[in-house]
Amino acid sequence: MPKLILASTSPWRRALLEKLQISFECAAPEVDETPRSDESPRQLVLRLAQEKAQSLASRYPDHLIIGSDQVCVLDGEITGKPLTEENARLQLRKASGNIVTFYTGLALFNSANGHLQTEVEPFDVHFRHLCEAEIDNYVRKEHPLHCAGSFKSEGFGITLFERLEGRDPNTLVGLPLIALCQMLRREGKNPLMG
């Protein structure tokens, strides 16, 4: 049975994969994540998830390699990590009363036989109408400077939302586990069977 590799150094993706209680290792993929001018958000995350998984194939020749990538889209534009408090407040002002869509690309690459499975999972976040004081307090308390969209749904960010819409809540954090389990079963690795 091939061993499992997570092509990521993200502590959030690692924590999500640990939920499945299967043995895996993490490795940093080497991929240029620059969007191409003609790519839609869906195409971008699908390409990057695939490239991340396949970039580790030579180092891990007999493994199942998981690649994942995510973008946050508001008003048709990709919203990145804010990096500053002012940018975080600006992103949250734009999101207030709107729907922010996250697209998460998932790839499972079997480096032993070259079989590749891919999927893109959308997830919609419906924001409440937020006043300036709420935005300021949230940014001060949560410091979401390294989170696309300027919030952490798994933390205090839940207070910002009216509702969440998607097949798998794990998708919002960065790794769609339901889709991954389906892919793993197709490769003969059922998480329920160890």
Curated annotation (Swiss-Prot):
SUPFAM superfamilies: ITPase-like. Its EC number is 3.6.1.-. Disulfide bonds: none annotated. It is an enzyme of class 3 (hydrolase). It comes from the Bacteria. One of its GO terms (cellular component) is cytoplasm. The active site is at 69 (proton acceptor). Coiled coil: none annotated. The record marks 12, 70, 154 as: Important for substrate specificity. It is found in: Cytoplasm. GO terms for biological process: nucleotide metabolic process. InterPro entries: ITPase-like_fam, Maf-like. It catalyses: N(7)-methyl-GTP + H2O = N(7)-methyl-GMP + diphosphate + H(+). Its cofactor is a divalent metal cation. Keywords: Cytoplasm, Hydrolase, Nucleotide metabolism. Nucleoside triphosphate pyrophosphatase that hydrolyzes 7-methyl-GTP (m(7)GTP). May have a dual role in cell division arrest and in preventing the incorporation of modified nucleotides into cellular nucleic acids. Belongs to the Maf family. YceF subfamily. NCBIfam families: maf. This is 7-methyl-GTP pyrophosphatase. The lineage of its organism: Bacteria, Pseudomonadati, Pseudomonadota, Gammaproteobacteria, Enterobacterales.
